[in-house]
Swiss-Prot record:
Disulfide pattern: none
GO molecular function list: peptidyl-prolyl cis-trans isomerase activity; ubiquitin-protein transferase activity
Function: May catalyze the cis-trans isomerization of proline imidic peptide bonds in oligopeptides thereby assisting the folding of proteins. May also function as a chaperone, playing a role in intracellular transport of proteins. May also have a protein ubiquitin ligase activity acting as an E3 ubiquitin protein ligase or as a ubiquitin-ubiquitin ligase promoting elongation of ubiquitin chains on proteins.
Organism: Arabidopsis thaliana (Mouse-ear cress)
An annotated GO cellular component: nucleus
Tissues where the protein occurs: Expressed in leaves, flower buds and stems. Lower levels of expression in roots.
Residue ranges, compositional bias (Basic and acidic residues): 510-525
Family as reported in the entry's similarity comment: Belongs to the cyclophilin-type PPIase family. PPIL2 subfamily.
Source taxonomy: Eukaryota, Viridiplantae, Streptophyta, Embryophyta, Tracheophyta
Name of the protein in its database record: Peptidyl-prolyl cis-trans isomerase CYP65
Main location as per UniProt: nucleus
Length: 595
């Protein structure tokens, strides 16, 4: 407190006060503070990605957002350089049991301080430490998971904690220029006032039926929902049943209608009718017999081979006079399904682009066999996708286009093939559509997004490995209330690139031919030895090698000494020597031509 305490109180604001406290300071607060983009977020929406792709500079995007952006602006959202859809590289991030992204080799959880790299040729993501220790230092330029060759130029840096300048969000091109894409969901939300109202399916159908002829008919019969209509139908059925009983009082009681073999089969095996619960053991036995007589689902690519068991025809004919006598036991022929160990590849040429599909023939052989055979027969040519749900899936494979048609190559449904290796996780998963357990036909669907609730309920048999931009274009097609695309999405032609089922036959024929060729060579060797077995040993002995060469040398020396000392006895002893010499010379194995 002094007498000059208000001497610095001015009637204006100084430049320093303006820059640090007043108007100038407010403009700084409105700016986005410095922040580096996390590795698990899309560089376009700044939200966590689900189906990531990246560019050669390491910028990561969500496939569903980057494709429309490229189509509209045609440039890189971060750098502003020209960019095409072909320049996008799909990434494969691996998660641990707790759902955290980690390195699949060292099992280290990724953090904001982890140096993360991706291999361009495969798309797998690793920590740089694993690549450095196991690839760069050892000069082993093979991918650590797939063993595919790559070069050092194929390494893409996703995150480098020592260089965060390229991940500053305020420096992105789309942030500086305010570039945005028109979201269809946002348009619907702005145009439809009831978009954010969460209603059940019955209420939605009821609101859609207001003012229609169907609503008038329901009101004419008393109105109400499904429960009221079912109660009225039950009451009418009870009245009609009582009337029919009154009319049949005078008639003799009719015997209970028996089940036919086909009805019993459908009732007891599939359990789809109300009579299935009433079916007894005899009906179930008849059902099994009917299914056996109808024949099981024989794979197209199967063959009959001999088993290690006999057919039993000889024993049956020996113990029973009802069979024709058989004196020869033949091996029983059994059916062997061909389960290839390779992958299959199919391409769909659609109205919105090409889809390249990899088929897991080694894990789901029957579903893949059905799919490949239908593609080869041209079954899918000209067939449209009749159902598409955004952020879920697109369904097709029905020639009728109703979702109720289509059949398998066997003319009947085939069983599911659930496997823990194939789950509904990730974008582009191809799975069989069905109406219940073991009801697979020709219909299939492709996922836009992971759907774990479908695991072990539908058979996963493939995945999209090329054409994710085409899949994104399909997802953006508007649909009507019944999820049918307003713009036709049709399969123009289905081409089979690799069919492991036919390649299996070719490999077997090739192996069989090589085996027969080797057997012929062995037979020739055995025949030459048997007809002239001493040819090789005689030549070997003449050259001074082989077994017994020292014994032959000693015998020849002894013969020379004997000739020099016993000249007087040449008439008698010489004959015996000649015989011995002849015997010793003919000790080798020969044929019987000299006899």
């Amino acid at each position: 407190m002094g007498k000059k305490q208000h001497s610095k109180d001015r009637m204006f604001i100084t430049k320093t006060e303006w820059a640090t406290e007043w108007g100038g300071a407010k403009s700084k607060e409105n700016r986005t503070p410095f922040k580096s983009l996390p590795y698990y977020c899309c560089a376009l929406t700044f939200l966590p990605f689900e189906d990531p792709v990246c560019t050669i500079d390491g910028s990561v995007f969500e496939i569903t957002t980057i494709v429309p952006y490229i189509r509209k602006f045609g440039k890189h959202p971060v750098t502003g350089a020209p960019l095409k859809g072909e320049d996008l590289i799909p990434l494969i991030f691996h998660k641990n049991s707790e759902g955290e992204y980690h390195c699949p080799v060292l099992n280290k959880v990724f953090t904001e301080f982890t140096h993360i790299v991706a291999v361009k040729t495969t798309g797998n993501v690793f920590c740089y430490e694993a690549i450095k220790e196991l690839n760069i230092k050892t000069k082993n330029w093979k991918e650590l998971l797939t063993e595919e060759p790559f070069t050092r130029a194929d390494l893409i840096t996703i995150q480098n904690p020592n260089a965060v300048d390229g991940k500053v969000t305020v420096e992105f091109d789309h942030v500086k220029n305010g570039l945005k894409i028109d979201d269809e969901e946002l348009k619907k939300m702005n145009s439809d006032p009831a978009y954010n109202i969460n209603v059940s399916g019955d209420i939605k159908h009821m609101l859609a039926d207001l003012g229609t002829d169907k609503a008038k008919e329901i009101a004419l019969h008393g109105g109400g929902g499904n429960k009221a209509r079912n109660e009225r139908a039950a009451a009418i059925a009870a009245i009609l049943e009582s009337r029919s009983k009154i009319k049949e009082v005078s008639k003799a009681e009719q015997p209970k209608q028996t089940y036919s073999v086909v009805d019993a089969a459908s009732a007891s095996v599939f359990g789809r009718s109300a009579d299935a619960a009433k079916a007894g053991s005899s009906d179930k036995t008849a059902a099994r017999i009917a299914m056996h007589m109808a024949g099981d689902r024989t794979p197209v690519n199967s063959k009959m081979v001999k088993s290690r068991y006999s057919s039993g025809a000889a024993s049956r004919s020996f113990t029973s006079s009802a069979f024709t006598p058989v004196t020869k036991n033949d091996f029983e022929l059994i059916k062997v399904e061909k389960n290839p160990k390779k992958k299959g590849y199919v391409q769909f040429q659609t109205t919105h682009g090409d889809l390249n599909i990899e088929l897991h023939c080694d894990i789901a052989p029957r579903a893949c066999e059905n799919f490949i055979t239908l593609c080869e027969r041209g079954y899918y040519n000209g067939v449209a996708f009749h159902r598409s749900i955004r952020n879920f899936m697109i369904q097709g494979g029905d020639p009728t286009g109703t979702g109720k048609g289509g059949e398998s190559i066997w003319g009947k449904p085939f069983k599911d093939e659930p496997n823990s290796k194939l789950l509904h996780s990730g974008r582009g998963v191809v799975s069989m559509a069905n109406s219940g357990p073991h009801t697979n036909g020709s219909q299939f669907f492709v996922l836009y997004k992971s759907a774990t609730h479908l695991n072990y309920k539908h058979t996963v048999f493939g995945g999209v490995v090329g054409g994710l931009a085409t899949l994104a274009a399909m997802e953006n097609v508007p649909v009507d209330e019944s999820d049918r695309p307003l713009e036709e999405i049709k399969i123009i032609e289905a081409s089979v690139f690799v069919n492991p089922y036919t390649e299996l036959d070719e490999e077997e024929e090739k192996e069989k031919a090589e085996k027969e060729k080797n057997e012929d060579k062995d037979i020739e060797k055995i025949g030459s030895w048997y007809s002239n077995p001493g040819s090789g040993t005689t030549e070997a002995g003449a050259g001074g090698g082989g077994v017994g060469k020292y014994l032959k040398a000693m015998s020849s020396t002894a013969t020379k000494d004997t000739k020099g000392s016993l000249d007087s006895d040449i008439s008698t002893i010489g004959v015996s020597k000649k015989r011995k010499t002849t015997a010793s010379a003919s000790t080798g194995f020969k044929d019987f031509s000299s006899w």
